[in-house]
Amino acid sequence: MCELRSGSQLIEHSTKAEERGLDFLSISDHIHPWLPEHEHSPFAWSVLGGVAAATSTIDIITGVTCPTFRYHPVIIAQAAATIAEMSNGRFTLGLGSGERLNEHVTGTEFPAVDLRHAMLHEAMDLMTELWTGEFITHRGDHFDADHVKIYEQAGTPVPMVLAVSGDQSLDLARDTRCAGIMAIDPDAELVEGWLERGGSAAGTWAEVPFAWEPTKEAGLKTARRFRFGIQGWEVAAELPNPAYFEAATQFLFDEQIGDAVPHGPDPEPYVQAMQGFLDAGFSNIAIVPVGDDFDATMDFWENDVRPQLQLSTGTTNGK
């Protein structure tokens, strides 16, 4: 979990993940952590450069970047193309419409989701144009670009994956020719909707938190670090800073957290959580280590969880 570790630790973990044979790495792109206790939130694009240089085979994805508020899409187009080149084509740009937590920080308005989707659509189209390697001038409803060319290219356009929650975002993924979708719930209707729109089952992404600890009691304490994800995205997208997430989650019962976040030494809750996504049709599942012991969490995955899964094309990461 990126908000629990420094940039240098994330790069170290990326090399360990590659050595263990994991398939991809995911990094969140935040300026704030979710909760005050998290303490870290390194600049994703600096870390990505380090990860691209330190690894050679493992795929890399942002989970996710919002290219429309604190960033301009021209800047993300250049950043993504650079990481794609540095990683020899191993990079995928995961995109979303943003959360107020991160996107209000430059003083811009954080509008309703329909307008955010319209801005994201324009940004994605603009980035796709820039990856052609031509000089681009764009005068849009939300963004302008003046005679700009991205010189650093990987040879092919950067594949894009879109965070989705329903028909509107699925339509956006289709209309912007995304390579895949990403979701936080094991919702088979999202996968079915993606396939109906011409998408590939291989381009479906999700994540599962792992609050592994040697005892159930310690695991529940660690699971509290992930309580920000229990309130639902309608709430999470609107809160402006970590203190608000602390206030919104302070009265959650241990039972609520324990039911939502797999924790402790018993592999069964982790197996159920991951199998739920696999059964819904998701192919790429990110492991989010919520505890401090990365190596022990990965050992637990390899020895206790993975052997019990009914896998087809499921893959894993250390987010």
Language-model-derived ranges and their functions:
Residues M1-K319:
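Active-site-adjacent structural elements that line small-molecule/cofactor binding pockets in enzymes
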